[in-house]
């Protein structure tokens, strides 16, 4: 509701207003009566006509962008030397920074052994070595932050290069607005369902 109070100050008559507040981890939607007659009331319960919310927010968009656009540089979608697909779960857990069990699993000693075995089996071991570096240096949040910075930059540009030099010198990934839209389509649909 606080997200709509600035807007309410601009109203000269009562209106029914949909306030959508997309936070880091949640999206909240409220339908409110707003206007001069409501502005100074401490108790706004009577002006609240409806509310809904979901546990999807901006962080989920960043995580999906990191997973879909950055993780292929770390081996996601790759194969073993025998042509068997590499498991996707370690890649998801690496970027699922809003999921404590997933992060605990990614940073477990058992997963460290899995990653070392994947390097031995992978058709492109240099990519999986990057994932091992994420594991060893606990770089999950930096990866998701790089995705967030890319998302922000793409609001004003049609394509950007996401620098990942903290993983490997000169490592970067080109991301377009279309790729961003594709990557975040699933969590964005959940947000739109609230509206």
Residue ranges, per PLM feature:
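Conserved A3 ("GATE") glycine/threonine-rich loop of ANL adenylate-forming enzymes
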Residues: 1-3, 25-26, 56-63
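Short flexible coil/turn linkers enriched for glycine and charged/polar residues
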Residues: 11-12, 22-26, 141, 156-158
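Phosphate-binding glycine-rich/basic clefts of nucleotide- and phosphate-handling proteins
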Residues: 33-168
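Alpha-helix capping and helix-loop boundary segments enriched in small/acidic/polar residues
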Residues: 14-20, 49-57, 171, 175, ...
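Well-ordered alpha-helical segments embedded in enzymatic catalytic cores
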Residues: 2-3, 146, 190, 194
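Conserved phosphate-binding catalytic cores of ATP/NTP-utilizing and phosphoryl-transfer enzymes
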Residues: 1-20
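Adenine-nucleotide phosphate-binding core of ATP-dependent small-molecule kinases
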Residues: 132-140, 169-195
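Short beta-strand scaffold segments in enzyme catalytic cores
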Residues: 28-32
